[in-house]
Amino acid sequence: MHDLIAIALPGGDRFVEEVRRAWADGDAVLPVDRRLPEQAVARLLAGLGPAWIVEGNGRRRLDPADARPLQDGDALVMATSGTTGEPKGVVHTHASIAASAAATSAHLGIDPDRHHWLACLPLAHIGGLSVVLRALWAGTGLTVVDGFDVETALASTATHLSLVPTALQRLGDRADRFERIVLGGSAPPQQLAANVVTTYGLTETGSGIVYDGWPLPGVEVREQHGELQVRGAMLLRAYRDGVDPRNADGWFATGDGGSVDADGFVRVYGRTDDLIITGAQKVWPDPVERIVARLDGVAEVAVVGRAHPEWGRQVTAVIVPNGRPPTLQAVRDAVKAELAPYCAPGAIELVDALPRTALGKVRRAAL
């Protein structure tokens, strides 16, 4: 019988060694976010059913009554939250991991004799762990550190790394030190260096599947009723509760709004839950945010819908100012110059910081 092994270790060589050990034994791994409070970790373990946990002082057996079986070929369970906020495990197989790593490596032209990955994002998130997985698959050099630090990254022998926009911003003009920077998480900056590749993906897709707007080899993307759907060998096998979210033809509904043009170029508008309906008109936050972010006096911005007695929801720009913020009229004029008038924010709010996840995505529900 195969076991699920929870790994609660900082980023480093030992984490990678424990992944290798588990796979050599035919087991699967569950990375645990060490920043979670004790009660949250307990809920995660109870919900996803590992048999063992690896911590700083070694491997510990968990209650056998709570352990849940795996299928042959299962390699990885990634914890992600469902709509209830309870942990939901995404199950990937060795085959889906290999498909993702192969597609990414082919697109980036990875040469195991020349290239070296730096893993510096949280390993309990697919954006961080996928760096480790693709390096192991391709046989490249790999350095794993417990968090991003500018000087550590620059001093490493890495040619490739994955970052979120806030980390990229900290690198500044030294980003050209790397051959390729794979960028995920929140919306990218307006101006990007030539060596930066923007990505779109989910835990269910095994990390990025669309690079600079184009699907990776072996990835199919289509739009159905305004929602992006994807198909390919890199998709999850199922959730930990056994539910396979793919339809009979293998398509997975992402929950993201977007479009695919006649040439296959993919545009992602945001989570369908983030769509703002104002006076029966539909407004996606992302295009509005990109315009407002270019204005003088705006360090960061998130666009949300606020309750409105007449329109139902009012488009509202939540701005982290950089010096003197723009006026509401300046924001509205800028948006109306590029988008339909109903997309223009009816209000602005100034805040000190935007709440973000570990991978830099704005937590809109917290605004």
What are these regions (language model features)?
Residues M1-L36, A119-P122:
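Conserved AMP-binding/adenylate-forming
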Residues Q39, E55-D74, S100-A101:
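Flexible, low-complexity linker/hinge segments
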Residues G232, G257-C343, A353, G360-V362:
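AMP-binding/adenylate-forming catalytic core of the ANL superfamily
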Residues T159-L163, A167-P215, E220-R222:
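Gly/Ser/Thr-rich phosphate-binding loop
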Residues P215, Q224-G250, R271, V283:
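Conserved ATP/PPi-binding loop(s) of AMP-dependent carboxylate-activating enzymes
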Residues D74-G89, S186, G201-E204:
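Conserved adenylation A10 loop of the ANL superfamily
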Residues P10, D63-A79, E86, G109-H116:
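Conserved pre-ATP/AMP-binding loop-to-beta segment of ANL
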Residues A46-G56, M78, K88-R170, R180:
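AMP-binding/adenylate-forming
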